C-alpha cells in the first residue's frame, strides 16, 4: 500500500531543497533496496515537474567487498566517470538509507577510512559546484528496519519519528521550512556579532572564539530533516573541557561518553567509556584531525531522542555539537582534515551558554526570540 508520507517527503525535497525546474537533470542515489520507497516517488514527482531524472543505485555489500579485498590502488580510486557526470547534472539527492547499519563493523578501520578519504575528491567537487551555484544537492533518509533497530524503535514508530522531524505532515511543509529559515537566519545573524561563546554543562566548561566567522542557518536546503545554526570556530580559539554524553557513531563503530580537553584549538587529552582506542586513532588520522572544524546549536525540537544517525542526532533540539577535523571554508574555517567527526553535547537539563559573558541559553533553549531581519525575511 502506497504511503503518502513518502510522496510528501519527495515533494519537499524537490520543491524546497532542490527547487527543481523543468528541463533540469536530477540524479537520485542510494542503496537500492533500502532507498526504494523514496526513490520511486522522487522519480515520479521529478518527471511530473518536467525534469530528467535518473538513478544511481548501489547494491548492499559491494562497498564491503572493495574494503575487504581491494588493493590500495583500488581503495584510492575515484571514478572519472562520476566526476564528469557531476559536472553535467543540475541537482542530486542522496538517500542515506541502509538495510544493515553494521556492515563495516568488522572490517579494517584504516582501509575503510582510506576509501572514504579518496571519495572526498567527489565531495569537494560537489561542494565547489554548490558554492558556485551550478549544482543543488540534498541528503535525506528513507526509514529502514536496520535504522529503526539502531534507534530502539519499531519500523512503524521510526517512520513516524522521521516524518514528524521532516514536518511532511504539516499543511504546507515548504512554508514551514521557509519560516524556520527566517528564524534561524536571524539567529545566525545575531551570533555573527559574538566574539566568544562559553559552554557550561556536566563535566563541561569550554570557551570557543567565533569572532569574524560566519554562522549559517540550516533549514532544509541540503538536509531533510534540518534545524541547526553552525560555524567554524577560530582554529586556535577553543579551550577547556567538554563531555559528549551521546555515543558518536563513525564508520559503523561507536565512541561512548567521550571527554576531551582542548588547548588552543587542539585536543590534548581524550578518553571514552567505550571506543577510546578508536577515538585516539581518529585523532591521529592527519594533522587537522585533532582540531575543531565546527560548533553548532541543534534546534529541531521534533528530534527529541538519540537514534545513532547523525542526520537526526546533530539536530536534537537543545543540544550542541562539535566536529573534530574538517572545517567549512565558506564560513571562514581553515582547519583541513579527512576527518569530520560530529560529537553531541546534551545541554537540555543543566546546560548554559554565554555569549561574550551574557547568558543566552539555558536548559536547551535560547532565552529570547530573534526577530527576522530584512535579510532573514528574504529566505525563500
Regions found by a protein language model. Give the residues of each.
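Short, glycine-/Ser/Thr-/acidic-enriched flexible segments
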Residues: 33-34, 98-100, 144, 204, ...
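A structural signal for short secondary-structure junctions
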Residues: 235-236, 251-254, 261-262, 286-290, ...
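Oxyanion-binding "anion nests"
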Residues: 225-270
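Short aromatic-centered micro-motifs
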Residues: 199, 261, 353
Amino acid at each position: 500500500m502506497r504511503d503518502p508520507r513518502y510522496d510528501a517527503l519527495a515533494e519537499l525535497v524537490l520543491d524546497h531543497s532542490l527547487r527543481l525546474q523543468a528541463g533540469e537533470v536530477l540524479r537520485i542515489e542510494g542503496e537500492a533496496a533500502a532507498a526504494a520507497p523514496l526513490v520511486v516517488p522522487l522519480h515520479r514527482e521529478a518527471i511530473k515537474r518536467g525534469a530528467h531524472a535518473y538513478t544511481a543505485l548501489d547494491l548492499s555489500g559491494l562497498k564491503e567487498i572493495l574494503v575487504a579485498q581491494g588493493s590500495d590502488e583500488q581503495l584510492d580510486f575515484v571514478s572519472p566517470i562520476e566526476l564528469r557526470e557531476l559536472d553535467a547534472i543540475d541537482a542530486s539527492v542522496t538517500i542515506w538509507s541502509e538495510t544493515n547499519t553494521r556492515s563495516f563493523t568488522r572490517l579494517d578501520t584504516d582501509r575503510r577510512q582510506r576509501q572514504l578519504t579518496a571519495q572526498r575528491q567527489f565531495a569537494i567537487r560537489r561542494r565547489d559546484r554548490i558554492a558556485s551555484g551550478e549544482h543543488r544537492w540534498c541528503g535525506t533518509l528513507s526509514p529502514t528496519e536496520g535504522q529503526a533497530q539502531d534507534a530502539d524503535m519499531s519500523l512503524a514508530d521510526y517512520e513516524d519519528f522521521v516524518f514528524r522531524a521532516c514536518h511532511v505532515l504539516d499543511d504546507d511543509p515548504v512554508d514551514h521550512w521557509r519560516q524556520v529559515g527566517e528564524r534561524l537566519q536571524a539567529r545566525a545573524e545575531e551570533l555573527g556579532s559574538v566574539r566568544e561563546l562559553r559552554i557550561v554543562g556536566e563535566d563541561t566548561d569550554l570557551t570557543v572564539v567565533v569572532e569574524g566567522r560566519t554562522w549559517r542557518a540550516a533549514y532544509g536546503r541540503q538536509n531533510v530533516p534540518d534545524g541547526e545554526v553552525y560555524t567554524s570556530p577560530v582554529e586556535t580559539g577553543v579551550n577547556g573541557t567538554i563531555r559528549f554524553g551521546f555515543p558518536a557513531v563513525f564508520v559503523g563503530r561507536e565512541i561512548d561518553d567521550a571527554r576531551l580537553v582542548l588547548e588552543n584549538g587542539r585536543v590534548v587529552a581524550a578518553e571514552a567509556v567505550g571506543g577510546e582506542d578508536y577515538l585516539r586513532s581518529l585523532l591521529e588520522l592527519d594533522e587537522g584531525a585533532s582540531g575543531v572544524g565546527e560548533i553548532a546549536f541543534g534546534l529541531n525540537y521534533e528530534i527529541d531522542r538519540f537514534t545513532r544517525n547523525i542526520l537526526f542526532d546533530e539536530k536534537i533540539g537543545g543540544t550542541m555539537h562539535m566536529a573534530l577535523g574538517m572545517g567549512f571554508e565558506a564560513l571562514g574555517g581553515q582547519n583541513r582534515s579527512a576527518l569530520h567527526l560530529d560529537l553531541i553535547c546534551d545541554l537540555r537539563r543543566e546546560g548554559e551558554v554565554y555569549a561574550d559573558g551574557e547568558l543566552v541559553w539555558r536548559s536547551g533553549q535560547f532565552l529570547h526570540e530573534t526577530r527576522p531581519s530584512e535579510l532573514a525575511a528574504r529566505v525563500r
